Amino acid sequence: MNMPPVAILAGGLGTRLSEETDQRPKPLVEIGGKPILWHVMKHYAAYGMNEFVIALGYKKEAMIRYFLDLHACESDVTVRTRDGAVEFHERPGMLDWNVHLIDTGPSTMTGGRIKRLARHLGNATFMLTWCDGISDIDLLDLLAFHRSHGKLATVTTVRAPSRFGYMDIGDDCGVRRFSEKPEHGDGWINAAFFVLEPGVFEYIAGDESMWEREPLQALAADGQLMAYRHRSFWRCMDTLREKIQLEELWSSGKAPWKIWR
């Protein structure tokens, strides 16, 4: 089965995690010695999804340097000091990813970033997520659910604190209404693991468009947004407190999102 490419939004300022993001972009903030973005990508790669299209913005140079250096840092290396010749030696378990790093501007909104990735994603189904959310979602089951209903968009939903946007979901998993801010704290919320068809780009006006507002609201109103309910682990690393909690889970050796070997 051909796997869809994975679009990842990684260009935001990360202001709620300023203790870390003053020095580095949020995607490179580390959990267990690896960037949070690495954890997100390992999750997708565990399901055979190895083609990544990453939207850059804030501190894009640091992001590019990280991926340029990644092969060298993952390899054993021989350096010949006489002439500076370098030879890399593969090690077992080395990453096998194709990563496209796309500059989507320093202040482009989430919808605008997605639209700027359109020409790099092709004319087929694609996955979409953010750089700071980790989960144990079965991505093949999510993809199968999306393909079963024939709509333009699938959003993964979870139960979580009331600071997240609320969705009114029908018995058939159709999203009847999408609200950026919740009206109460017991609804299903946007976990930002999407499966999308190219038709969603028509719902995005331009750089000032926030994906979580008009595009998702319009998709829901048109009956083109379906919800995949996830009842297991999901966390978003928005604050220093949440980073510390994820570090503790990783250090315990029982991180629920570590589904890879």
Regions found by a protein language model. Give the residues of each.
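N-terminal glycine-rich phosphate-binding loop and ensuing alpha1 helix
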Residues: N2-A72, L101
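Conserved beta-loop-beta/alpha segment of the NTase-like Rossmann-fold superfamily
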Residues: A62-G170
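Acidic-glycine-rich active-site phosphate/pyrophosphate-binding loop
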Residues: G12, Y166-V175
